[in-house]
Amino acid sequence: PRTFSSAASDVYKRQLLINVGTPDEPTVKSVRDYLREFLLDPDVIDAPYIIRQLLVRGIILRVRPKKVAPLYQKIWMEDGSPLRVYSDRITKSLNSMVEDVEFEFAMRYGNPSIKFGLESLKQKGVEELLLLPMFPHYAQATTESALKHAYKQLKLINWQPKIIEMGHFETDEEYVIPLTKSIQSQIDKDTHLLFSYHGLPVSHVKRIDKSKNHCQQLDNCCAIKSEANQLCYGHHCMLTTQTVVGLLGLKEEQWSLSFQSRIGPVKWLEPSTTNKVEELVNRGIKKLAIVAPAFLADGLETLEELDIGIREHFLELGGEELTVIKCLNDNQDWVEGLSKLVDKKFSQSATA
């Protein structure tokens, strides 16, 4: 394996914390515990406290765990949740690849917890800590929630290392080049490529726009670069898409963008993946490939929602061939890219 040495190793010991989330087991109880922690996070459902409690405890947790647990059972791997298995593999690969940085992974929701990861790093005498939420596109419900929770846990364990944050990396070549390569081998000139991103309530992206004149106010607002949408999730998704489309050399009619994994009756980013697939079949698309760039590791949203649910839907509508492209997972190009992203961030910190 190739070995990378991060910059300024004589100045600090540097460590990495990776933040993701999954149930411990594919059981109703475990899924309920996971969903409770996940959905009661005010950064995920930003309704007033009482309404959020009533919605989650009174409705969602009574119904959804029974529906979701069997779906997890379909995709569960021998060593556990796919998300946890791939996170563990990525961490081990990074630790063998990078000389002077020790990597730990933790889950924002579920186990191993962020607190557990931080305590482990504290015991090892870490002086400089990079917090890396494993989400290429910034969102309050993912990136912001993970960082806020990490700072809260740091305070609880009374630890004050030098902190570096990795906020988002939607167009960094270390991410988009491995992503593009993973797509390239799965499509040909007759394939329509659908970029399916995790959905987000419109209220979350509108909150980012302090001007109140851009988000959902302009046609195709996510495609227009502006001071107002520098941290907009929809804009970041569009930037990734445009970058990959450019690298692949696709024409406008050869690709589409959509959003999946909706929960609840609020307004979400459009179009939905389900509706977009229907539209594409109605346009005469018979050969479709779907890539989910917001997910760095395969999980329920890709292995079940796309590869089982959307596949069945596409074929029932009259589609003929569907390829669901695997997430980057522990792909060697991506792991090397991630190590370079980390090195770049530490180098920037050392010269700041």
Q: Where are each of the predicted segments found?
A:
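A solvent-exposed, charged loop/short amphipathic helix patch at secondary-structure junctions
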Residues: 37-41, 208-229
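A short, acidic, amphipathic alpha-helical segment used as a generic capping/interface helix at domain edges
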Residues: 118-119, 264-285, 309-311
